[in-house]
Amino acid sequence: MKFAKGHGTQNDFVLLPDLTADLALTPAAVAALCDRRQGLGADGVLRVTTAGAARAAGVFDRLPEGVVEGDWYMDYRNADGSIAQMCGNGVRVFAHYLRASGLESRDEFVVGSLAGPRPVVLNALAGVGADVTVEMGKANQLGVGAATVGGRQFNGLAVDVGNPHLACVDAAMSSRELAALDVAAPVVFDAAQFPDGVNVEVLTAPEDGAVSMRVHERGVGETRSCGTGTVAAAVAALAHQGSQTGSLTVRIPGGEVVVTITDANSYLRGPSVLVAHGDLADEWWAAQG
């Protein structure tokens, strides 16, 4: 079984080309594949298929709103095997893989997801790297909330980027203090407000057009980056300074991206790197069930 490995600002993924969408991506198999000791290791799995094939194979009962059968479809699974609606870093790596593998010849096309269609632009391809912009859709503010991260309570802005986020700006926190925060520890949040869980971002206040951010992703834990999280962080940071639109550089442990928020849309631009291609042992995969 063929696979590829890639990352977007060190948010890493195993890509499984499966154009007929007939692989059994059970939670146990996905979790084993993402395990950094017994599997390949990753923050998530990206099945590479089309929307029509995914629907025909029963991956979903009906096409997500705005997605058509001919669109590419990113079937994304978290490291614990759960299904996720959207992954901004994953879309960049997914689009890069399509172009680099020859499955796609265009530099502009649409990637479907459970959160809907995500138009992409490959700005540059160079060796194993790419610079990709993703149209992420409108980021909707859903009020305020609070979460406990690393034993500290933070107030934040709830933001829907196709998946739920609580982005917490701490104006008193320095980048050094943020780096010392135990983001890997389990987070505590209002389950009534976020019944399906939530991704929690903690970030510094904007300075010179940039913020620093760390993230605890639902179903994964702390990751080096989270694409949708950087969009949510940009929305919260702009709101913190009294703005609804603008562009910010978001610095995460895995690198940096540029997020642009408009009245009707949001855009995520950043790198993708494809680091490996190979074959999974069929016997190992079959044993994961």
Curated annotation (Swiss-Prot):
Pfam families (UniProt xref): DAP_epimerase (PF01678)
Localization annotation: Cytoplasm
Gene Ontology BP terms: lysine biosynthetic process via diaminopimelate
Known EC number: 5.1.1.7
Entry GO terms, CC: cytosol
Enzyme class: isomerase
SUPFAM superfamilies recorded: Diaminopimelate epimerase-like (SSF54506)
UniProt pathway: Amino-acid biosynthesis; L-lysine biosynthesis via DAP pathway; DL-2,6-diaminopimelate from LL-2,6-diaminopimelate: step 1/1
Protein role: Catalyzes the stereoinversion of LL-2,6-diaminopimelate (L,L-DAP) to meso-diaminopimelate (meso-DAP), a precursor of L-lysine and an essential component of the bacterial peptidoglycan.
Complexes and interactors: Homodimer.
Protein name: Diaminopimelate epimerase
Lineage: Bacteria, Bacillati, Actinomycetota, Actinomycetes, Mycobacteriales
